[in-house]
Structure formats: structure tokens, C-alpha cells
Amino acid sequence: MFAFAIDDKYPVTKNHKLIIPRRHVRSFFELGNAEYKGVLELLKKEKEELSRKDATISAFNVGINDGKDSGQTIIHCHIHLIPRRKDDVSDPTGGVRGVFPEKRKYP
């Protein structure tokens, strides 16, 4: 197996997971083809498992902070799998665009 999943130490929502490659790479873009495939297969498996276990989950955010200027604080590639639930925020419009609040709303 090329990756493993853990609970995020500082979860954004309940059951927030991290998908982490076993080999140390700083960037998602440094993954080899087999690693890339393995990481994404585990991401999908974890999503399916969470959906099966928790009927309140209605959507997911999937995110990668790649590089210090993106907000990456742990300099080892990892993917966030963040379960979302209806009404967990008052207005989810813009999704990950909320990183830049002024860009959150767009035509």
C-alpha cells in the first residue's frame, strides 16, 4: 500500500481525514504514478466508508495545500478529506474559494 489514512489532529468537521503517502514527498506533484493511483484509491475508499458509516454526511471537500505559500504547514504531501453536512455553515457558496473571502462569490 502506498498510503494510509488518519484522523486530522485539528479537524475542520467531524471525521476529517488525512490521506498520507508512505514515502516522504513534499509535494503532491512529486508522487510517482503508482503512488498517485494508490493515494487516490485510498481517498475514494475512505470517502465511501465515511458515507456508509455516517448518514448525516451529504458532501465532501477534498483539498491539498501544496507549498508553504498555499498554507501547507506539514511539509509532507497529504490530502484532506472533509465531510460536510447540510447546514454545517450558513452559506457554503464558493467552497474552497473561501480561502480568499473576496473571491468566494463569483458570477
Positions of the model-derived regions?
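HIT superfamily nucleotide-processing domains
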Residues: 1-107
